[in-house]
Design a protein with these regions (language model features):
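Short helix-loop "hinge" at the ATP-lid/N-box region of the Bergerat-fold HATPase_c
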Residues: 145-146
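Short alpha-helical segment of the dimerization/phosphotransfer core of two-component systems
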Residues: 65-70
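Conserved glycine-rich
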Residues: 216-217
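Short conserved segment of the HATPase_c
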Residues: 177-190
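Short alpha-helical Gxxx[C/S/T] motif in the catalytic ATP-binding
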Residues: 203, 207
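Acidic ATP/Mg2+-coordinating residue in the GHKL
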Residues: 172
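Short beta-strand/loop element within the Bergerat-fold HATPase_c
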Residues: 152-164
Length: 239
């Protein structure tokens, strides 16, 4: 009897996993098809004989941007698949929190400057973990804050270490997160109601997987009067 129950539970688990896989494949196909459709349209426009040089350069720039988005999508999906498969071995090395935050944000400095946004980093102490993977996790969260903060806004990151954990708090003075989106923002392929057409809904999901894979936690909440706040903790022992 117990064997029958166990087999039934395994069958139900397999059925759920197959359904999840089918949904994921459908989501991935849709995510890739959207920019590919735009690329096809751009190629058609580039073939017009009366195209001015200025217009051609504009279309080529848009084409490169779309190709970069597809490249980022595929790279991120491959990282997620590696984490899903359990093939990632996170390093355990002592890393300065200041070094971690600066490296996490380095690719975002120019986009922030173009938006007139201010980035403030206050960090003290260290954490034990994998520097490259954790940079990826934090960079995705900061990028999300940047995209939801108006021009001239501010993003502030505070990091400190205590006897129990190393904590990183990322705050912005942007639009915040709608109450209905808040419980779902770390879910794979979830797009909030205020997300633009460029969002794939996987950056924050990847961040959570990387942080959780190192025994850490991440939560999001709204600030008063405006803005969002992400709190990351890497624990020094089992919690």
């Amino acid at each position: 009897y117990k064997m029958t129950i166990r087999l039934r539970e395994q069958q139900q688990t397999l059925t759920r996993e197959k359904a999840h896989l089918a949904d994921s494949i459908a989501d991935i196909s849709h995510q890739i098809r959207t920019p590919l459709t735009s690329i096809n349209l751009l190629i058609g426009l580039l073939s017009e004989p009366k195209l001015t040089d200025a217009r051609r350069q504009q279309l080529i720039h848009a084409l490169y941007e779309l190709l970069s988005r597809i490249d980022w999508l595929i790279t991120t999906l491959l990282k997620i698949s590696r984490l899903d498969a359990g093939t990632v071995q996170f390093k355990q090395e002592q890393v300065s929190l200041e070094e971690l935050l600066k490296k996490s944000c380095v690719t975002l400095l120019i986009p922030m400057e173009l938006r007139g946004q201010e980035l403030l980093i206050h960090a003290d102490g260290a954490f034990r973990g994998d520097l490259p993977w954790t940079c990826e996790a934090i960079g995705n969260i900061v990028k999300n804050c940047m995209e939801h903060t108006p021009e001239g806004g501010r993003i502030e990151i505070d990091a400190a270490e205590n006897a129990l954990y190393s904590e990183i708090i990322i705050k912005d003075n942007g639009t915040g997160i709608s109450p209905e989106d808040l419980p779902h923002i770390f879910e794979r392929f979830y797009k909030g109601k205020d997300s633009d057409g460029k969002s794939f809904g996987i950056g924050l999901a990847l961040s959570r997987m990387i942080i959780a894979g190192q025994g850490g936690t991440v939560k999001a909440e709204n600030r008063k009067p405006v803005g969002a706040m992400f709190t990351i903790r890497f624990y020094k022992g089992t919690v």
